[in-house]
């Protein structure tokens, strides 16, 4: 986890969010305060810590205005485990479908991956050295010893598939001769100089366990985990390049070098203290009519989510995790329903409310130009790989923003995502022809934009389908 990130002041956090997200200052301020409060809580005495729960946030605003991106970027700034789920994917306990506890298990999986990646980075040099030593032996193998063992009758019955658990599965090798030692020394130098990266080598890799798809999602996962622990891991041979083999072997050696149990415990603590769960489309499970069966089911999902927000002990394959100090961010457009349509207990668990504004033409202009890797910069970089230089004029960017805004007004308002569809449509011909026009320079002007888009953007029926 990035310990420096969590110490950032709210101003610093907002400043970092501004590098990627345009506008929505109120939302940025509130998530920055929530993040800073976590740091403040970490400095308190243990008994004080237990009394202070995070203030969950409810974001209200149309799609494409930055709700998810603000939460995701915030988590990335501090290296906190983050998971996005959709409330509509869950079903009430007792029905077929995902139960709400699965989002906590998914968060723990993310935390485990974060912790293990960090620990692996600390032993990367040692793991890479071991991987290179192994590669040298694979490229210049010793003679194999003949296996002195009789046939197991069960092997014939099961097609030779009975593993010999009592013995080492790798074939034993003869001690290397002087000639082999000399060759290995030469190969080692060539490996260090990067001369053998494209050479092919055969290595043994763990085979992915077969999926058990006939059961429901959660039952499937639990039984799959149990079977994976009981059954020995099967390895298969693959022919890969030296470069790929080094990555695979280094990852395997890094796994062996880190303490798995300690890593799992640290991941559980990280998920408990720093985990962020983003519940999207929470407005879709809100209801103001409790008569229909569908509304009763939606209310059931709300009641299932409630204990997790209040603090529950959830069993995962890595151990039990407490949700009491996780930060939950609910989000929804609330076009049809209102936050007050959520059950009162759930409303009370989202004390911080923030309304995100719809995007204006000026916002679209800023989105196209200001972020660290804005959409315009992305397309310029992509086409530059084909040696095609694309230059967007300020007037062209203004025209693109106006068209995006107008199409959003005339059809469904999908916020900044409209810019993706419009840019893709405008640059479709150029992207197709780019490989055959090296060293070309293309100036994107308002006239170019209109030639490619005006006939579509002015026709509401066409723009509804194409843009």
UniProtKB/Swiss-Prot annotation:
ATP binds at residues 22, 64-69, 280, 345, 417. One of its GO terms (cellular component) is HslUV protease complex. InterPro entries: AAA+_ATPase, ATP-dep_Clp_protease_ClpX, ATPase_AAA_core, Clp_ATPase_C, HslU, P-loop_NTPase. One of its GO terms (biological process) is protein unfolding. Keywords: ATP-binding, Chaperone, Cytoplasm, Nucleotide-binding. It is found in: Cytoplasm. One of its GO terms (molecular function) is ATP hydrolysis activity. Residues 166-185 are annotated as: Disordered. The keyword Acetylation does not apply. Belongs to the ClpX chaperone family. HslU subfamily. A double ring-shaped homohexamer of HslV is capped on each side by a ring-shaped HslU homohexamer. The assembly of the HslU/HslV complex is dependent on binding of ATP. ATPase subunit of a proteasome-like degradation complex; this subunit has chaperone activity. The binding of ATP and its subsequent hydrolysis by HslU are essential for unfolding of protein substrates subsequently hydrolyzed by HslV. HslU recognizes the N-terminal part of its protein substrates and unfolds these before they are guided to HslV for hydrolysis. This is ATP-dependent protease ATPase subunit HslU. The lineage of its organism: Bacteria, Bacillati, Bacillota, Bacilli, Bacillales.
